[in-house]
Amino acid sequence: FIFSADNGTSTRIVSKQKDGSRVRGGKGSPTYRGTHVPLVIAWGDKIGGKTSDRIADLTDIFPTIADICGIDIPEEWDIDGISLFPEINGEEPLEKDLCLVHFNPLWPTTPAPYASRYAMNDDYAYFWDGRIYEYKKDPEFRNPVMYADASEELKAAVADLKARVDEVDFYPDMPGQPRRSDYGTFYDFAPPQNPF
């Protein structure tokens, strides 16, 4: 049994935390509260009773299922995810340094005016335009970290995050630019034919 979600809860929902604080949902936004979701994996008496605060995303589901089933994924597929099975099976976890978040909703009635993209590691989120946030302390992404004041360690992390953001093509819209696309142009795009 694998349960997760594709976005945070509605902004109309305010959840009370164990410490008494209240957190408003962030669905429909590229903030930490809009993209941070639970991941629950259960398998009878084989998997359960463990928690992890490791960085993971939905690209990890396919390799995890393949690993559980004993299926090798061909290297030429060049997938982004890793198997979480070693960790949930009590073995040494595979390393995952960062996740990429691309936000470009194509809502038919009230489209978001801008696309956005960032890469995040265990501590920081680096946006396409150079903004850096310490997202656990600033989940709404309101107070960017000043790069000029950053430690050498943070500058090295930013270089890795920036490389990930820059290596993926932007389609259909460039972050920060007014939208060029809508449902019609997005879905009229003719992708290459599937070779399988």
Predicted regions and their residues:
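Generic enzyme active-site microenvironment
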Residues: 4-5
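C-terminal cap/loop subdomain of S1 sulfatases and analogous C-terminal strand-loop tails that border
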Residues: 9-21, 25-30, 47, 54, ...
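Ligand-binding/active-site lining segments
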Residues: 33
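The feature captures the short pre-catalytic strand/loop hairpin that immediately precedes
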Residues: 39-47
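A structural signal for alpha-helix termini and helix-coil/disorder junctions
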Residues: 43, 71, 90, 163-171
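Long, internal low-complexity/basic segments
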Residues: 61, 115, 121, 137-196
